Design a protein with these regions (language model features):
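Alpha/beta-hydrolase fold nucleophile elbow
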Residues: 115-126
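Conserved alpha/beta-hydrolase
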Residues: 54, 61-87
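Alpha/beta-hydrolase-fold enzymes
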Residues: 127, 131-224
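Structural cue for short, hydrophobic secondary-structure segments
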Residues: 46-49, 73
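Alpha/beta-hydrolase active-site loop
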Residues: 92-112
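An N-terminal hydrophobic leader/cap segment in hydrolases
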Residues: 1-25, 29-36
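Active-site glycine-rich loops that stabilize anionic/oxyanionic intermediates
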Residues: 41, 48-52, 60
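Alpha/beta-hydrolase fold active-site loops
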Residues: 41-44, 119
């Protein structure tokens, strides 16, 4: 079921015909999709990374349209304007990582309902790359896929931190701590406190400034550390 949702076209700086839609997944969680439906060559499904939101990909949608493609991006559960699963909306939490597949299925159903141009293609970044890999293994109907820094593993330096993470995650569930913020992570969004000179996200100063401006304009997009 689709219903109108906000899409901040002025902040996205994407194609001018962007529309937002609420979509409810099979498990009842409501997500948001943003659609730019002008390119007739096909539609690119955009799978954002953790902490991201649709409007961050307006520039990508503009470039895709320049090459003849429509696009659709998603706010995953727990981030952007999609349903947050905890009272503290700054904690990025999902019950099971596989639950993101409900969002993928809802996104695909919405694309079909809206009659978006086929074939479908995929661009996936970071955490979106991990979600996309599982979806592809489950035969998601896309013609081709492109991955940007996919989260197919998490680097720990020094490696002993990986052992500590395993131990903490194993103990968190029986002690009812699995929904609390992971140790060492912040309650605030990274780009709101980290200076550009020392940030680990991008070497593109205008992009970093844009991300910061986005969260100042729409604080509800902000997300702190994961559970």
């Amino acid at each position: 079921m689709l219903s109108p949702a906000p899409l901040y076209n002025d902040l996205a700086v994407g194609p001018t015909n962007g529309t937002g839609h609420w979509v409810t997944g099979q498990d009842g969680v409501r997500i948001r999709i943003g659609v730019w439906n002008s390119g007739a060559k096909g539609t690119v499904l955009i799978f954002p990374g953790r902490t991201e939101y649709i409007e961050k990909y307006g520039g990508a949608a503009r470039e895709l349209l320049r090459h003849g493609y429509s696009s659709v991006a998603v706010d995953w559960r727990g981030q952007g304007l999609a349903d947050r699963l905890q009272l503290d909306r700054n904690i990025g939490h999902v019950i099971n990582f596989t639950d993101y597949q409900y969002d993928v299925q809802a996104m695909l159903r919405a694309a079909d309902t809206l009659g978006l141009h086929k074939p479908y293609y995929l661009v996936a970044h970071s955490m979106g790359g991990c979600i996309a890999l599982r979806a592809l293994m489950q035969k998601m109907p896309v013609q081709a896929s492109s991955f940007s820094a996919p989260m197919w593993g998490i680097a720990f330096h020094p490696p002993v931190k990986r052992v500590m993470a395993w131990g903490l995650s194993t103990l968190a569930h029986p002690f009812a701590l699995s929904e609390t913020r992971a140790p060492g992570t912040s309650i605030t969004a990274y780009v709101t406190t980290e200076p550009f000179a020392t940030n680990s996200l991008t070497c593109d100063a205008p992009m970093f400034a844009q991300m910061k401006a986005h969260l100042e304009a729409v604080p509800d997009w902000a997300l702190g550390g994961p559970s």
